[in-house]
């Protein structure tokens, strides 16, 4: 499984919204400018995140997006699966030896567990720690 810019930028969007909880709606333009990313590309990613209930859109002159939940409960796995699809390391395992199938399954489960056990709040702690050093 290769996490593409979809997953990486999806995490960027949601982390920025998590950082700014309480600041009101945040525009994609401000995230794009702050992170030097394409606003147009972020617009393509926000729809699936909104449809999945991870973010919420606020209309109006001062509209934008807010995180639709507690950063302690939204996981990296939620975001990656929404934008990338299921976590698959090997396309087909039927033709593999039992030992190889076991390896691929353990690897997939390890990746899945890390993504599902890492919340936005966890990632925010790491970003704050790295900004302090």
Give names to the regions the model predicted.
Residues 3-7, 11-37, 66:
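N-terminal helix-turn-helix DNA-binding core of bacterial DNA-binding proteins
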Residues 33, 50-51:
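Alpha-helical residues within the helix-turn-helix
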Residues 40:
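Key DNA-contact positions within bacterial/archaeal DNA-binding proteins
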Residues 45:
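Residues within the DNA-recognition helix of helix-turn-helix
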Residues 54-67:
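Beta-hairpin "wing" of winged helix-turn-helix
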Residues 71-96:
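Conserved segment of winged-helix/HTH DNA-binding domains
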Residues 92-133:
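C-terminal regulatory/oligomerization modules of transcriptional regulators
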């Amino acid at each position: 499984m290769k996490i593409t810019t979809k997953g990486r930028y999806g995490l960027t969007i949601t982390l920025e919204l998590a950082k700014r909880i309480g600041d009101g709606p945040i525009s994609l333009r401000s995230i794009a400018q702050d992170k030097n990313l394409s606003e147009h590309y972020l617009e393509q990613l926000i729809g699936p995140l909104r449809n999945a209930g991870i973010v919420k859109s606020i209309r109006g002159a001062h509209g934008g997006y807010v995180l639709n939940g507690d950063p302690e409960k939204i996981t990296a796995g939620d975001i990656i699966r929404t934008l990338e699809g299921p976590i698959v390391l090997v396309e087909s395992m039927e033709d593999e030896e039992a030992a190889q199938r076991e390896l691929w399954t353990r690897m997939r489960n390890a990746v899945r567990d890390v993504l599902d056990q890492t919340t936005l709040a966890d990632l925010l702690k790491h970003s704050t720690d790295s900004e302090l050093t």
